[in-house]
Structure formats: structure tokens, C-alpha cells
């Protein structure tokens, strides 16, 4: 190539790069130039901006021969929307064949495969890009892909989740001011939380990473997935006000995405049904309730009543039977409560299994049991003992509605004694987390 041709090609590439950068800036900074009310228009606006950019790129290219880099930039422009683009796949595949060291082409091609649903091919692209050059985009995307790879065993999936956290941490280390890296680290911790027995320390790390994403990058606050994923964690931790706020914000930012609105509505319906059932003690007639409570026996405490109960520290302790009304917020060590089931409530998500518990002292308390298999449950009239109950008082306000109730959180059905009997180990399952894979 002659010197002046080289210079022309260089200028053309520079102009193409500027056009693509402007396109991505339009998409990523959309809510800095538009109000949240325009959220429903965003995808259409981005699509139109992409078409305009592609026309401008064709004009700039003319008859100039600038192979791999130009193919990559055109493929990247086509890849700006959340949808899979076959044309982008063709252009980017050509680009990496012509110039295998072109890391950005590998990253873009990986994203195309990701949108196509070919997770294994996406993994190959991001891993391959890292062999050419360590870069934060490949690390971010590899973290994301590792959590979605098909595995033959739970152990293998756990290894992938741990590796996902490692890759996200490396991405953060490369640029602590990149909000996307912090957001993906939050998602990696979210998966780790559900994959390793819901350690509160890990949920705190997830929430901290999401907060850091918003702190270092204003655009992160406009990411509906961040709000939905964080709300999922808040809901599981029974921070219902924050969960509702997050679902609502995600729905506002992406009105075309039905899930946030559905999740907000489901949670509101759950809280409404629950508070109504608690207030009416499961609509149990006073005479029936009196008869049920009259059947409570010390024998119903099972291993919680004879000094054989083993606490979380592994020591055998004698538990003191106390009325539900005397419980303090938090874990009530050395205490056991015993009551009758007056209703049960399941949601579409099946987690938690919720039932109402009453003792002779009066008020009805919600008991929320986590990590249960679908076939497990308790029946109205069952006697249930809960050792060292973890109490929480809820005061929730959302969109003009108020919900107020008390609940006992039970991390596994294995802690419960039902009709004097400990629960079988087959009653326990582990929670999983679902997310929208194409939108990290």
C-alpha cells in the first residue's frame, strides 16, 4: 500500500471508530439526554441511530480497502442492540480470520454468540481474546459466560461460579472506575450466594458491588438488570420495601421487559394475601382455633424439648419454651416456640414456603421456610416447633400501600419439628437464581 493510501486508510478507520463510539455513547448515555418517560422508546431510538451510523460508515468507506478493522467496526455497530444479528456474526468472523490478534473483534463476536444462545462459542471467543491480550472486556464477558455454561455436575457448576467471581475481580482490578465490571462482580457474587448456602457475607459483597457500580458510573443507575438482580437479593433477604422499589425501577427503565412488573405485582399480591391471612388467623373460627390449641402437647417439641437440641455452635442445649409474643427481633438463642399451623401460602416462585403459626398467647406470626423441596409442606392443624427462632418486624410502604407484620425466618426445613418429628434430609433443596442472560 502506498504511503498516501495508508494515510487515507488510517483516517478512514479513525472516522469509522468515532462513528461507532458515538453510537455506543448514544445507547449507554441514553438517560442522560432523555427522561425516564422515554424508556419505552429507547430500543427504537438505538435501532434508528444504528441504521444512521451504518449509512455514514458506508459513505466514509467509499472504495478504500481497510479490511479487518473496518469489518470489526461495522460488526460492532450492528451489535449495538440486544438482539442477535446474523450479519454481525458474518462480518466479525471474517475480521478474526483476517486478523486473529484483533481482540475487540473476538469480544464482539463472543457477544454475538452470547445473544444467539451459543454460550460455548462465546466462551471460546472470550478465552481466545485473553490469550492475545489481557483486557477488562474479555474478563467481564468471561465472568458472565462461565455462570451460564452447561455442566454435567453441581460441583463443576460451583467451580465455574467461583471462576466467574475471579474473572470479575480481575476486570475490576484493571479499571476500578468501570461500572460494568462492578455490576458483573455483583452478579457473580449473587450466583455465589445462591450456590454456597446463602452466606450473608456474600450477599453483602453483592450489594456493595452494585452500589460501587452506581457510584463510579452514573450509567449503571440506568441499567434495569442491576435493579432487578439487586431486588431479587433484597426479596430473598426479606427486605421487601427495597425489593419492590428495585422491581419498580427496572420496569420503569425497560417497559418492554415484562419480568420486573410481574415480579413487583407478585410480591405485592403475596404481601396482601399474607397480611390478610395473618389478621384473620387463616380465617379460622374461634371455636376451631381453641380446639386446635388445646391439642398442643410438650411431646410436640420432639428433640427441642428434651435437651437433645444441637445449636449452630454444635453444642447440645436445653431450650426454654416461650410464647411467640415474647420473641425479640433477631435470633432468640436458647428459646423454642411451639404453635399450630392455621394457613399455608405458596407463591409461583415456591420460595419461601410460608405458613401462619399461632400459640395460646394470641397473635399470628408468619413463618418463612427456605431451601425446601417442592413436595415439602405443613398442613393446617400441624404442631410446629421452631428452635432459636429468628424474628423480624416488617413495615413496608409502596405506592400508597402499607403492610405490617412479624415473621420468623427458617433457613431450612431441617430446623423444624413437625408433630414431634424432626424433618427428613430429603425435605431440603437449595435455592437457585435466574437472570436475563443476554443483558449483562
From Swiss-Prot:
Q: Which GO terms describe its molecular function?
A: chromatin binding; DNA binding; ribosome binding
Q: Which GO terms describe its cellular component?
A: cytoplasm; cytoplasmic vesicle; cytosol; mitochondrial matrix; mitochondrion; nucleoplasm; nucleus
GO terms for biological process? cellular response to starvation; DNA damage response; DNA repair; positive regulation of mRNA catabolic process; positive regulation of transcription by RNA polymerase II
Instruction: Give the subcellular location.
Output: Nucleus; Cytoplasm; Cytoplasmic vesicle; Mitochondrion matrix
Concerning PTM, the database record says: Phosphorylation by ATM kinase induces nuclear accumulation while interfering with nuclear export, and phosphorylation by CHEK2 kinase enhances nuclear stability.
- Repeat TPR: residue ranges? 7-61, 68-98, 103-130, 136-174, 179-216, 224-253
Nuclear export signal (motif): residue ranges: 13-24
Keyword Mitochondrion on entry: yes
Membrane spanning segments where?
none
- Which positions carry Phosphoserine? 203, 221
| Keyword presence, DNA repair | yes
InterPro entries, per the entry: TPR-like_helical_dom_sf, TPR_rpt, TTC5_OB, TTC5_OB_sf, Ycf3/AcsC/BcsC/TPR_MFPF
Query: Which domain of life does the protein's organism represent?
Result: Eukaryota
Annotated site (Mediates interaction with N-terminal MREI motif of beta-tubulin nascent chain), which positions? 147, 225, 259
Predominant place of localization:
nucleus
Per the record, which residues fall in region Mediates interaction with 28S rRNA of ribosome-coding tubulin?
285-287
Alphabetical keyword list: Cytoplasm, Cytoplasmic vesicle, DNA damage, DNA repair, Mitochondrion, Nucleus, Phosphoprotein, Repeat, TPR repeat
The free-text domain note is: The tetratricopep-repeat (TPR) motifs may function as protein interaction domains.
Function statement = Cofactor involved in the regulation of various cellular mechanisms such as actin regulation, autophagy, chromatin regulation and DNA repair. In physiological conditions, interacts with cofactor JMY in the cytoplasm which prevents JMY's actin nucleation activity and ability to activate the Arp2/3 complex. Acts as a negative regulator of nutrient stress-induced autophagy by inhibiting JMY's interaction with MAP1LC3B, thereby preventing autophagosome formation. Involves in tubulin autoregulation by promoting its degradation in response to excess soluble tubulin.
What interactions and quaternary structure are annotated? Answer: Interacts with JMY and p300/EP300; the interaction occurs in the nucleus and augments the association between JMY and p300/EP300 in response to DNA damage. Interacts with PRMT5; the interaction is DNA damage-dependent and promotes PRMT5 interaction with p53/TP53 and subsequent methylation. Forms a complex with HSF1 and p300/EP300; these interactions augment chromatin-bound HSF1 and p300/EP300 histone acetyltransferase activity, resulting in enhanced heat-shock-responsive transcription.
Q: What protein is this chain from?
A: Tetratricopeptide repeat protein 5
**Gene of origin?**
Ttc5
Amino acid at each position: 500500500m502506498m504511503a498516501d493510501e495508508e494515510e487515507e486508510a488510517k483516517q478512514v478507520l479513525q472516522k469509522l471508530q468515532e462513528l461507532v463510539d458515538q453510537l455506543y455513547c448514544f445507547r449507554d448515555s441514553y438517560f442522560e439526554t432523555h427522561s425516564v418517560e422515554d424508556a419505552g422508546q429507547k430500543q427504537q431510538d438505538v435501532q434508528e441511530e444504528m441504521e444512521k451510523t451504518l449509512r455514514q460508515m458506508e459513505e466514509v468507506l467509499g472504495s478504500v480497502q481497510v479490511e479487518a478493522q473496518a469489518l470489526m467496526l461495522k460488526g460492532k455497530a450492528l451489535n449495538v442492540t440486544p438482539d442477535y444479528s446474523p450479519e454481525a456474526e458474518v462480518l466479525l468472523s471474517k475480521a478474526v480470520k483476517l486478523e486473529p490478534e484483533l481482540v475487540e473483534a473476538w469480544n464482539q463476536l463472543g457477544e454475538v454468540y452470547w445473544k444467539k444462545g451459543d454460550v460455548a462459542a462465546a466462551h471460546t471467543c472470550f478465552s481466545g481474546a485473553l490469550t492475545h491480550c489481557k483486557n477488562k472486556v474479555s474478563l467481564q464477558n468471561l465472568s458472565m459466560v462461565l455462570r451460564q455454561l452447561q455442566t454435567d455436575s453441581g460441583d463443576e457448576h460451583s467451580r465455574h461460579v467461583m471462576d466467574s467471581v475471579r474473572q470479575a475481580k480481575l476486570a475490576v482490578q484493571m479499571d476500578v472506575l468501570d461500572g460494568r465490571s462492578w455490576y458483573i462482580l455483583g452478579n457473580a457474587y449473587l450466583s455465589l450466594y445462591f450456590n454456597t448456602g446463602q452466606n450473608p457475607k456474600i450477599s453483602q459483597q453483592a450489594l456493595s458491588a452494585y452500589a460501587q457500580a452506581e457510584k463510579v458510573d452514573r450509567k449503571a443507575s440506568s441499567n434495569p438488570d442491576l435493579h432487578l438482580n439487586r431486588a431479587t437479593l433484597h426479596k430473598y433477604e426479606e427486605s421487601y420495601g427495597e425489593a419492590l422499589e428495585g422491581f419498580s425501577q427496572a420496569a420503569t427503565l425497560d417497559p418492554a421487559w415484562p419480568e420486573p412488573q410481574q415480579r413487583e405485582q407478585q410480591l405485592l399480591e403475596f404481601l396482601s394475601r399474607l397480611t390478610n391471612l395473618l389478621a384473620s388467623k387463616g380465617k379460622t373460627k374461634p371455636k376451631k382455633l381453641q380446639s386446635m390449641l388445646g391439642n398442643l402437647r410438650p411431646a410436640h417439641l420432639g428433640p427441642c424439648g428434651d435437651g437433645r437440641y444441637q445449636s449452630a455452635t454444635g453444642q447440645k442445649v436445653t431450650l426454654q419454651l416461650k410464647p411467640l409474643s415474647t420473641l425479640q427481633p433477631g435470633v432468640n438463642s436458647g428459646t423454642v416456640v411451639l404453635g399450630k399451623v392455621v394457613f399455608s401460602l405458596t407463591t409461583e416462585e415456591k420460595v419461601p414456603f410460608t405458613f401462619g403459626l399461632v400459640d395460646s398467647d394470641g397473635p399470628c406470626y408468619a413463618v418463612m421456610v427456605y431451601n425446601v423441596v417442592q413436595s415439602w409442606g405443613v398442613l393446617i392443624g400441624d404442631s410446629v416447633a421452631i428452635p432459636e427462632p429468628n424474628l423480624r418486624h416488617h413495615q413496608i410502604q409502596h405506592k400508597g400501600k402499607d403492610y405490617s407484620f412479624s415473621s420468623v425466618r427458617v433457613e431450612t426445613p431441617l430446623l423444624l419439628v413437625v408433630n414431634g418429628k424432626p424433618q427428613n434430609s430429603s425435605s431440603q433443596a437449595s435455592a437457585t437464581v435466574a437472570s436475563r442472560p443476554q443483558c449483562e
